Amino acid sequence: PIHSSAASDVYKRQIQPYGDVPILAAGGIVTGKQMAAAMAMGASGAWCGSVWLTTIESEVEPVIKEKMVAANSSQTVRSRSRTGKHSRQLVTPWTQAWEADSAPEPLPMPLQPMVAEPALQKVNKLAAGGHEGAKDLATYWVGQGVGLMNQSISASDVVQEFKEDFINAFERLNNFVS
């Protein structure tokens, strides 16, 4: 199993040794509050990935966006089923089948995508057409922050929410030292 560390432990180990070198925090940052927390621990900024996947402008299939909006953080898994390398994605019967004891070992990259992607593209096409079994199988890369991504909004609204959350968190922290 792949183990995770608390974000504060990771930031402490990864940021402190570099002194004045700007470091971006990444992983699980889907709100302005989380960005402010990372910066309070020493990061110079944040790299945000998953939060953009449920935006209106995202290329992600609507069926998968719906699954992401409904998901919680425990409904992701690091799996080699898609690329041959560990990547976090939605848990589905597809990922569970590849993780089963009786499953074949995923092929190394670049071979596993040659096996997985044609099948997953077919799954997505069927899911978009309303096929219930395909909807269950459909998966996509997404981080554990998915549990906080509860609606599909525009990218500009994501930026605005980040800004407001960040400012509120910053002001709250500032009040502790004032």
Residue locations for each model-derived region?
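Single conserved hydrophobic/aromatic residue that forms the stacking wall/gate
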Residues: 1-7, 11
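Alpha/beta catalytic cores of nucleotide-metabolism and tRNA/nucleoside-modifying enzymes
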Residues: 16-17, 32-178
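Gly/Ser-rich catalytic serine loop of serine hydrolases
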Residues: 26-32
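Short beta-strand/loop segments at the ligand-binding rim of alpha/beta enzyme cores
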Residues: 17-26
